[in-house]
C-alpha cells in the first residue's frame, strides 16, 4: 500500500494506493454510488466496511445527472438516516459521484466528512483528490460548488478491470493534461512506454502531481489553474452537446487540442511541441471528430467558464512541454480564428 500525504492548513489527509483495506468506522456512513458502479463494486466495498450504520443511495449514471435533483436525493437520504456532524458520506464511483458527494457533504450540517473511493481512472488521478466539488446547472458545468477536502482517498486498481476502453482512455486524457502542464518526464514516459506496463506508477505520479499542486494552491489562486488546461473549451463542448456525446475526458481532449491551436497561434508552442502533444493524444485514441455548430454561440459559452473575470476569458495554455501560462485579453479575432478551424 503506497501513501501520499496531503498536508493543508485546515485539513490534512492521505491518499492510499493499493488493495482496498478494511475500513472501520465508529459512526454512521451513507454510501453514494451510481447505477452502474453499484452493480459492479458495491458488494466489494460492503465486505470491507464496518460502521455503526450503513445506508446506500444509488444515483443514475451519467454527467447529466450531476444536478440539483441528485443532490437533493443524497441530502434526503442523509436526513432520513439521521446523519449527524460526526457521520460521513462515502463516494463510490467516478468523477460525477465524487463531485456531488463532496458538495453534498460540504453543505450538510455546514460540513461533514466524506471518503472518496474512485472507480474510474479519471477519478483516481484527478477528481477524487483536491477538494473541488460541485454540480452542473443549465447555465454551465460545476458553476455551483465548494472546496471541501475528503477525509481519505482509497485508490484500488482492481476497479479499473471493469472499465470500458472508452472510459479508461478518458482518464488518460487527464493524465496527459497534468503531464503537459507540470511534468515533461511524465510526458516522456507516456510516449515511450506501454501504459499497461507502468499503470500503477503513472497513477501514483499523477496523483503526486495533483497533491503537490493542491498543497501549494488549495483554492486555485495561481498554480492550480494549470489543472484546467483544456477545460475552458472542453466545458463549452460538453454544454453544446448536452453532456451526452462525449465523456468528460473526451471533451477535455478536444479542449486541449483547441488550446494547443491557440497556443501555437500565440507562439507559446513550437510546431514540434504542438505535434508532440497531438501524437501523444493520438497514441491513446484521443483524437475525436467535432464540429462547432454555431461559432458565435460557442464563443459566448466560453465566458461562462469560472475562470472568466471582467468579461475576459482566461485560457490555460501550454508553454512548451511541462509548463503553462494563464492567458487573458486575447483578441476576439484570434480566438474566432481557432474556432473556425473546428467549424
Swiss-Prot record:
Keywords attached to this entry: Amino-acid biosynthesis, Aromatic amino acid biosynthesis, Cobalt, Cytoplasm, Lyase, Metal-binding, NAD, Nucleotide-binding, Zinc
Any GO BP: chorismate biosynthetic process
Protein's UniProt keywords contain Transit peptide: no
Pfam families (UniProt xref): DHQ_synthase, DHQS_C
GO cellular component: cytoplasm
Cofactor: Co(2+); Zn(2+); NAD(+)
Compartments (UniProt record): Cytoplasm
Cofactor note: Binds 1 divalent metal cation per subunit. Can use either Co(2+) or Zn(2+).
A GO molecular function held by the record: metal ion binding
InterPro entries, per the entry: Dehydroquinate_synthase, DHQ_synth_AroB, DHQ_synth_fam, DHQS/DOIS_N, DHQS_C
Family label: Belongs to the sugar phosphate cyclases superfamily. Dehydroquinate synthase family.
HAMAP family membership: DHQ_synthase
Function: Catalyzes the conversion of 3-deoxy-D-arabino-heptulosonate 7-phosphate (DAHP) to dehydroquinate (DHQ).
Protein name: 3-dehydroquinate synthase
